[in-house]
């Protein structure tokens, strides 16, 4: 778009790249006059200020000159650093003089601005250029083949590059080589260019166009390649730009023909060698890629010619153009908006006229009434592709899954004599792993879960633990997978049964000894202690005690039996008497109250037991209310089983004792709640140390959610290893809970889901996509987790189970593959598209859908197997991506015959109207009058209607060698061959024998014999008459071609109808084309003869080369199932290319490739290819599916270079053609 504008008819020169700010010098042109016809000349310097939105450029200085200029350049000689203007302005005058100006003095306003000047040339100096390696060297060219090399340090005596070229002519262009400093080129209007070597002082190469119509108006060296240059032609009869390589000067390397009239000036960008500016008499300014000839940008200009065009050295996106209308314009190739330009025009009009009548009446103008117009496009588009200076030389970006995507723009290597091929840009995808320890621990956890080695895993963690708390946690987790877990928990809390028993025994022995010491001073009475036998002295205290009880019981029994003693029942008024009276009357409650009143607690408890459970409970309460000791609360809880009170009221320092009591006495239904209650107290009321112990309570309770919450509070969860610590404990605890409690294994709380999502993100960032998907919660509707699951599934190439794909911001409509248009004259009925996507789910597929792997129609559809393990034990599986199927119907022939269930491959649009090879079958060649309807292939599938069986779709297709073309030569083949059955002789049935709905198009081919008159007298046909094979192409197929061998079993007996059209209702038409159902029977064609093709011109007499060979029935084997994808992928790719190709030559190549790939399919049927070739072909298919055709070509080259030529020579060349065309067409 246009940035600035100067109203001058002048030559131009940009300040060097080192100069800042940017200046533009203009000198009055010697070739034109301005609108005022002034003969004055001047030299001006303007400053480029892009921050100023106006179109005007600021004029810094003006120098009135006595010369007009043919060429003006600004050299970097004697440049100084900083913002001071420096360098030297070099001008070529009209009188043969070369003048050096000091731009700093011009801006300063000095009068003596000329550094030096010489008039050695005869005639105007039209060509000037500065050597970019030695900036003190300047080349100039003028009339009579004069070329001088000036040294700015010694400007007095110039040198010549050699003898003048003959014949003498004007020098219109001159340019120094951009790579070699001693090479100079000059060109003349006659079309000849001369390359000079200053070291030899002679011309080394002369380049000229053979048609002698080149009038050179521009010359430029390639910025990167030393041997290439371009020449522009001013001749309207040959408005071209020729690109030459000096190593091959016989003809141009490339010719750019974008202009319609002569080219006046060219300029090659030093910042990007793919940008070449050109302006011509067609009033166009074009920016082209000289390496490919493509026009990248056309500047919006007016209808005026431009005679000079230049790039800005400092800002490569800016250029200037001087036109014959007296304006010098500054443009940008990066696009922009033109609203400011239109506003400037409006402002200029307003400032000129104001709001008054311009005709002197002094009256204000009425408002201008204009019809409403649509606003023009105000945005100017930039280049088609970014220039090199804004392209990143390298780039890197992290993608999902921890992959680092990098690229680099390598400099292309120029090869002599070879057209520059499109540069291949490579993108490198690397897996970046930053947390190796994290991944190693995650792998160990997954292995433990998969092998269910939880005990050994926990024991390993216990051994590796350095902190006591970490060791306790893993010890508690380990107990969950062992028997008698509560006893093991007690042991971990310090309560071992064996140790406690030993302590009690020791305490009893100590008490016994104390009692024995007291008996030495006081003899026991007979009533207090029974006599001990001497033999009992060695017994233990317990045995002694039990023995005494037995003896007492025995003695009492003997006493009752031998002699009954009497006792007194006192009913006095004291406490004993009252108790006696209460007992005699059965009033246990009063008796207990009396005992409690008299502080006889043991008697009260014993009587309460006799009085029943209710009385015992009340007595226990009264007892506990009166008796206060250190263990009373504990005894109370033991007796009343009120452990919630203990958990809520115990001292938190005794949390271990409280947890031990819960482990010993709590019922299974209250155990988890009591552990949670104790954990909540520790977490909310305790200090930092006690808060960490709450995790042990939650582990005992199996409360994963609270364990996550507590751990998140007491631990640093910001590092990956800290999160790994938590996930290890969570996963192990969840597995323990699933084993010991009847809980939903998929139930996940919000906090746990968040942690699992973070963990899955970390795993995915390290490249463990499968593991991340395993740890991700399965049954949550949180948007972040749903999105992450979708991304993980897509990264693995599948869709989440029970979830539809998340829709993109825009809908991408897939183009149906393998779909041919209907034949002229046909009206296709309602058909399903050739490509439909089905996904296994609850809904049955449409009729005719063949489930993958379903051989028995009654068998249920197979589903993809789930992974061997899953952190959530999710039920169901994730189905794979929906597969592509061709909607088809499979039919059975004959009553009671079962249908053949074979998935039909997608029907490719015929490229040459060749029939596909029919499937092998032994069904009769005729259609029975009544056909059974096949059973549904899927439960709930509707039965197909009988009307779907039509004569066009019921007969098998002819063999692939029988190619019939109806129409003029060159017309594309149609799909009629897929719908029409064969006649008795292997040809199409006559038009009169077909139903009216099937008579399509002209029936005579390009080389068919004239049609016989129906009224002609019929001749008797002999019985052994052999009808000839119709000619179907200009040249017969060779005998060795497997495609030319037709399957021809013996002819049907006379009287057997080979074609019985089914009666159709009025207005009904048989569906034709490649979407009609096809029968699986073979084509019945009588034997015939073949005419082999011989070498020679088409149509030449063949002579005695005709042979009558009997044909045999040849049945091709099916392609193995694992290699069928090769055929479908290659055919689908060819069809996409055919749809995108526009030129006939490309289509012919693709048609030929489609035929010759049959050699590959035959080798696949015979399984004669080596495994390396087959594996390489499958890799090519993968690259085609990802549209990475460059990778496919690399694989192709590897296969060809490493395999036997005889194996691949039949099909690999055409496969390369297909890949190249696909890459070129971008399908």
Swiss-Prot record:
It is found in: Cytoplasm; Cytoplasmic vesicle, COPII-coated vesicle membrane; Endoplasmic reticulum membrane. Keywords: Cytoplasm, Cytoplasmic vesicle, Endoplasmic reticulum, ER-Golgi transport, Membrane, Protein transport, Repeat, Transport, WD repeat. Residues 995-1006, 1057-1069 have a biased composition (Polar residues). PROSITE patterns: WD_REPEATS_2, WD_REPEATS_REGION. COPII is composed of at least 5 proteins: the SEC23/24 complex, the SEC13/31 complex and SAR1. SEC13 and SEC31 make a 2:2 tetramer that forms the edge element of the COPII outer coat. The tetramer self-assembles in multiple copies to form the complete polyhedral cage. Interacts (via WD 8) with SEC13. Component of the coat protein complex II (COPII) which promotes the formation of transport vesicles from the endoplasmic reticulum (ER). The coat has two main functions, the physical deformation of the endoplasmic reticulum membrane into vesicles and the selection of cargo molecules. Belongs to the WD repeat SEC31 family. Residues 925-945 have a biased composition (Pro residues). WD repeats lie at residues 4-47, 64-111, 120-160, 166-206, 209-254, 258-298, 301-342, 397-430. One of its GO terms (molecular function) is structural molecule activity. PANTHER family: PROTEIN TRANSPORT PROTEIN SEC31A, SEC31-RELATED PROTEIN. Residues 804-875, 905-1008, 1040-1075 are annotated as: Disordered. This is Protein transport protein Sec31A. GO terms for cellular component: COPII vesicle coat; COPII-coated ER to Golgi transport vesicle; endoplasmic reticulum exit site; endoplasmic reticulum membrane. It is a peripheral membrane protein. Gene3D superfamilies: 1.25.40.1030, Functional domain of the splicing factor Prp18 (1.20.940.10), YVTN repeat-like/Quinoprotein amine dehydrogenase (2.130.10.10). Residues 905-924, 1040-1049 have a biased composition (Low complexity). The keyword tRNA processing does not apply. The keyword Cytoplasm applies. One of its GO terms (biological process) is COPII-coated vesicle cargo loading. It comes from the Eukaryota.
């Amino acid at each position: 778009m246009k940035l600035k504008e100067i109203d001058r008819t002048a030559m131009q020169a940009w300040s060097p790249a080192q100069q800042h700010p940017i200046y533009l010098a203009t000198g009055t042109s010697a070739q034109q006059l301005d609108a005022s016809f002034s003969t004055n000349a001047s030299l001006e310097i303007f400053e480029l200020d892009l921050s100023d939105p106006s179109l005007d450029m600021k004029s810094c200085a003006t120098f009135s000159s006595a010369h007009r200029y043919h060429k003006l350049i600004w050299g970097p000689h004697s440049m100084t650093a900083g913002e001071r203007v420096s360098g030297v302005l070099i001008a070529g005058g009209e009188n043969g003089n070369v003048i050096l100006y000091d731009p700093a003095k011009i801006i300063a306003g000095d009068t003596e601005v000329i550094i030096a000047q010489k008039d050695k040339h005869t005639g105007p100096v039209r060509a000037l250029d500065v050597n970019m390696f030695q900036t003190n060297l300047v080349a100039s060219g003028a009339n009579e083949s004069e070329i001088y090399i000036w040294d700015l340090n010694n400007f007095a005596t110039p040198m010549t590059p050699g003898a003048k070229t003959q014949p003498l002519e004007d020098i219109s262009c001159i340019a120094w080589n951009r790579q070699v400093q001693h090479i100079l080129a000059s060109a003349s209007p006659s079309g000849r260019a001369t390359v000079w070597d200053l070291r030899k002082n002679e011309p080394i190469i002369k380049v000229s166009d053979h048609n002698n119509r080149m009038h050179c108006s521009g010359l430029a060296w390639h910025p990167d390649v030393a041997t290439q240059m371009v020449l522009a032609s001013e001749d309207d009869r040959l408005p071209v730009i020729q690109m030459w390589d000096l190593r091959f000067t016989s003809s141009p390397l490339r010719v750019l023909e974008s202009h319609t009239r002569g080219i006046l000036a060219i300029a090659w960008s030093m910042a990007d060698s793919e940008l070449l500016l050109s302006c011509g008499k067609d009033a166009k300014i074009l920016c082209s890629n000289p390496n490919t000839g493509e026009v990248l940008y056309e500047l919006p200009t007016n209808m005026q010619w431009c005679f000079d065009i230049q790039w800005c050295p400092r800002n490569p996106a800016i250029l200037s153009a001087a036109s014959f209308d007296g304006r010098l314009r500054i443009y940008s190739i990066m696009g922009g908006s033109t609203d400011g330009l239109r506003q400037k025009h409006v402002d200029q009009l307003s400032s000129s006229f104001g709001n008054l009548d311009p005709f002197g009446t002094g009256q204000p103008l009425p408002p201008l009434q204009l019809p409403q117009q649509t606003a023009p496009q105000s945005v100017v588009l930039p280049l088609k592709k970014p220039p090199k200076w804004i392209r990143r030389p390298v780039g890197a970006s992290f993608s999902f899954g921890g992959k680092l995507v990098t690229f680099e723009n390598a400099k292309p290597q120029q090869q002599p004599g070879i057209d520059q091929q499109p540069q291949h840009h490579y993108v490198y995808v690397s897996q970046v792993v930053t947390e190796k320890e994290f991944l190693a621990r995650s792998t160990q956890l997954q292995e433990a879960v998969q092998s269910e080695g939880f005990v050994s895993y926990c024991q390993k963690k216990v051994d590796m633990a350095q902190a006591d708390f970490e060791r306790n946690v893993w010890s508690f987790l380990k107990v969950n997978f062992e028997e008698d877990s509560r006893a093991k928990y007690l042991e971990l809390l310090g309560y071992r049964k064996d140790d406690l028993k030993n302590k009690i025994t020791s305490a009893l022995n100590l008490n016994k000894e104390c009692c024995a010491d007291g008996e030495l001073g006081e003899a026991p009475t007979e009533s207090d202690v029974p006599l001990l036998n001497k033999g009992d002295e060695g017994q233990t205290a317990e045995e002694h005690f039990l023995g005494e009880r037995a003896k007492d019981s025995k003695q009492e029994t003997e006493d009752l039996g031998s002699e009954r003693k009497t006792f007194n029942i006192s009913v006095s008024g004291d406490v004993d008497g009252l108790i006696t009276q209460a007992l005699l009357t059965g009033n246990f409650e009063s008796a207990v109250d009396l005992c409690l009143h008299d502080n006889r607690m043991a008697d009260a408890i014993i009587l309460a037991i006799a009085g029943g459970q209710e009385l015992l409970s009340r007595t226990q309460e009264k007892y506990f209310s009166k008796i206060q000791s250190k263990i009373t609360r504990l005894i109370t809880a033991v007796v009343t089983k009120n452990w919630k009170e203990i958990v809520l009221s115990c001292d938190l320092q005794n949390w271990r004792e409280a947890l031990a009591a819960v482990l010993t006495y709590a019922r299974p239904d209250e155990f988890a709640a009591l552990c949670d209650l104790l954990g909540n107290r520790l977490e909310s009321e305790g200090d930092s140390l006690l808060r960490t112990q709450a995790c042990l309570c939650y582990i005992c309770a199996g409360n994963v959610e609270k364990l996550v919450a507590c751990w998140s509070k007491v631990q640093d969860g910001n590092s990956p290893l800290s999160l790994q610590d938590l996930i290890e404990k969570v996963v192990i605890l969840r597995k323990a809970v699933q084993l010991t409690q009847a809980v939903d294994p998929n139930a996940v709380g919000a906090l746990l889901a968040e942690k699992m999502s973070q963990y899955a993100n970390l795993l995915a960032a390290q490249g463990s996509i499968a593991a991340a998907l395993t740890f991700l919660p399965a049954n949550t509707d949180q948007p972040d987790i749903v999105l992450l699951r979708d991304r993980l599934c897509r990264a693995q190439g599948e869709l989440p189970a029970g979830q539809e794909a998340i829709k993109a911001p825009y809908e991408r409509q897939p183009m149906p593959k393998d779909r041919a248009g209907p034949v002229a004259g046909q009206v296709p009925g309602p058909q399903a598209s050739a490509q439909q996507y089905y996904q296994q789910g609850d809904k049955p597929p449409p009729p005719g859908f063949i489930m993958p792997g379903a051989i028995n129609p009654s068998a249920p559809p197979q589903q993809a197997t789930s992974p061997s393990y899953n952190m959530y034990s999710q039920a169901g599986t994730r189905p794979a991506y929906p597969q592509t199927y061709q909607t088809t119907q499979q039919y059975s022939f004959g009553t009671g015959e079962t249908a053949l269930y074979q998935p039909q491959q997608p029907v490719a649009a015929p490229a040459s109207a060749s029939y596909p090879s029919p499937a092998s079958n032994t069904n009769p060649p005729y259609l029975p009058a009544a056909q059974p309807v096949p059973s549904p292939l899927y439960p709930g599938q509707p039965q197909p209607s009988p009307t779907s069986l039509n004569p066009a779709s019921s007969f098998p297709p002819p063999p692939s060698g029988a190619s019939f073309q109806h129409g003029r030569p060159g017309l594309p083949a149609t799909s009629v061959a897929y719908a029409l059955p064969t006649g008795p002789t292997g040809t199409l049935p006559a038009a009169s024998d077909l139903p009216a709905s099937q008579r399509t198009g002209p029936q005579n081919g390009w080389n068919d014999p004239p049609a016989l008159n129906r009224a002609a007298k019929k001749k008797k046909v002999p019985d052994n008459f052999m009808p000839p094979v119709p000619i179907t192409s200009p040249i017969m197929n060779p005998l060795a071609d497997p495609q030319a061998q037709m399957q021809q079993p013996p002819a049907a007996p006379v009287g057997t109808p080979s074609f019985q059209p089914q009666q159709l209702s009025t207005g009904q038409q048989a569906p034709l084309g490649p979407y009609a159902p096809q029968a699986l029977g073979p084509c019945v064609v009588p034997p015939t003869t073949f005419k082999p093709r011989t070498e020679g011109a088409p149509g030449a007499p063949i002579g005695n080369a005709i042979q009558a060979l009997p044909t045999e029935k040849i049945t091709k084997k099916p392609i193995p199932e694992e290699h069928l994808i090769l055929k479908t992928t290659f055919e689908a790719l060819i069809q996409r290319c055919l749809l995108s190709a526009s030129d006939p030559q490309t289509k012919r190549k693709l048609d030929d490739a489609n035929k010759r790939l049959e050699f590959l399919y035959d080798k696949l049927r015979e399984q004669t290819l080596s495994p390396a070739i087959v594996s390489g072909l499958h890799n090519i298919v993968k690259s085609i599916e990802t549209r990475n055709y460059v990778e496919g070509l690399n694989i192709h080259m590897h296969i060809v270079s490493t395999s036997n030529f005889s194996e691949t020579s039949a099909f690999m060349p055409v496969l390369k053609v297909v890949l190249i065309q696909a890459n070129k067409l971008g399908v």
